[in-house]
Amino acid sequence: MNNLYKEINFPFPFNFVFPKDKFKIQVRYDFENNLSDEYKNWFFERDIYIGHAHVVNIGPNSKYDYVPIHGDGDWIDNHVKINYTFCKHPVTINWYDTDEKYLKKSYTPLNHSMLTADEDKYTKMYTKNQLNPNGQCYLFNAGQLHGLEKVESLCTTFCLVIKNKDGSHLQWDKAMELFDF
């Protein structure tokens, strides 16, 4: 069974406010002021919330035309994000496996922790080709090693990091129960 990617049709609209600077790889997203109360209440009713949100921008002919292989956080697990991706061309997302002894801690431009490893230490385990990702909403396993291949056009992804009421990350199996629509 795939525990890495699932397209969802969220029952409420998401108010997309695109960053003014499309050439920064990662910027904070003000979800508190840009999400409807209906959207936030849906999470609250299920004892989950958005821990933080950011926007990732990658584009051709720039320093950032792909997303390097990494795992979000301090360890490998199955925590999820909700992503909304906008891109005029198909996007390829890959997930990878590696022996944990090769993992190295690093940080994103927003100072969030992540794990990386040398490229020759990875084994590709799953690929998802988003053929028409313009506004596609999906659950995304961010706790496993993943990366995006080079893109042909500007690609903007809104990432919502989902947490349980106790502050822990929402894990894939529980997300499948909550987002079964």
Where are these predicted regions, by residue range?
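Catalytic core of Fe(II)/2-oxoglutarate
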Residues: 109-181
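A general secondary-structure boundary signal
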Residues: 4-13, 94, 139, 159-161
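Non-catalytic surface loops within mature trypsin-like serine protease
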Residues: 12, 86-88, 162-166
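A general structural signal for short secondary-structure junctions and capping/turn motifs
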Residues: 42-47, 71-76, 128-131, 148-152
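Non-heme Fe(II)/2-oxoglutarate
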Residues: 1-58, 63-66
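Catalytic core of non-heme Fe(II) oxygenases with the double-stranded beta-helix
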Residues: 59-137
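Extracellular structured ligand-interaction cores
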Residues: 5, 77-83, 90, 145, ...
